[in-house]
UniProtKB/Swiss-Prot annotation:
Broad class of the protein's primary localization: nucleus
PROSITE patterns, per the entry: HISTONE_H2A
Name under which the protein is recorded: Histone H2A
Positions of short motif [ST]-Q motif: 131-132
Subcellular location: Nucleus; Chromosome
Biological role: Core component of nucleosome which plays a central role in DNA double strand break (DSB) repair. Nucleosomes wrap and compact DNA into chromatin, limiting DNA accessibility to the cellular machineries which require DNA as a template. Histones thereby play a central role in transcription regulation, DNA repair, DNA replication and chromosomal stability. DNA accessibility is regulated via a complex set of post-translational modifications of histones, also called histone code, and nucleosome remodeling.
GO molecular function: DNA binding; protein heterodimerization activity; structural constituent of chromatin
Other comment: In contrast to vertebrates and insects, its C-terminus is not monoubiquitinated.
GO cellular component: nucleosome; nucleus
Bias (Gly residues): 1-11
Protein species of origin: Neurospora crassa (strain ATCC 24698 / 74-OR23-1A / CBS 708.71 / DSM 1257 / FGSC 987)
PTMs per UniProt: Phosphorylated to form H2AS128ph (gamma-H2A) in response to DNA double-strand breaks (DSBs) generated by exogenous genotoxic agents and by stalled replication forks. Phosphorylation is dependent on the DNA damage checkpoint kinases mec-1/ATR and tel-1/ATM, spreads on either side of a detected DSB site and may mark the surrounding chromatin for recruitment of proteins required for DNA damage signaling and repair. Gamma-H2A is removed from the DNA prior to the strand invasion-primer extension step of the repair process and subsequently dephosphorylated.
Example GO BP: heterochromatin formation
Record Pfam families: Histone (PF00125), Histone_H2A_C (PF16211)
Amino acid sequence: MTGGGKSGGKASGSKNAQSRSSKAGLAFPVGRVHRLLRKGNYAQRVGAGAPVYLAAVLEYLAAEILELAGNAARDNKKTRIIPRHLQLAIRNDEELNKLLGHVTIAQGGVLPNIHQNLLPKKTGKTGKNASQEL
């Protein structure tokens, strides 16, 4: 038997192999974040906890934006999130707008806003007409 090992081709101890993402209870890939941190020349060394923490933060931000965008889509009676819904979600949330203030979203449009000076003047009805409107 050539090239054999007692584990049948699998690495030793891989019987119950578990990804770092599943260990941390995350959907975002911890291994990929770790690789990108190493390849990005941000520092000479990357600790073991840094990619887990960063993946958790990225997952939280994505979930927050998608939840608000889903609400915007539902308000517009749509079942699919489009860039317009992302734009509305981000710009209507104070903290996300501050974080992504200089980000341009393609096909996002602008927030509906009419300046106060352009609105028609409200004429206040006073006198006996106002008292008879009960």
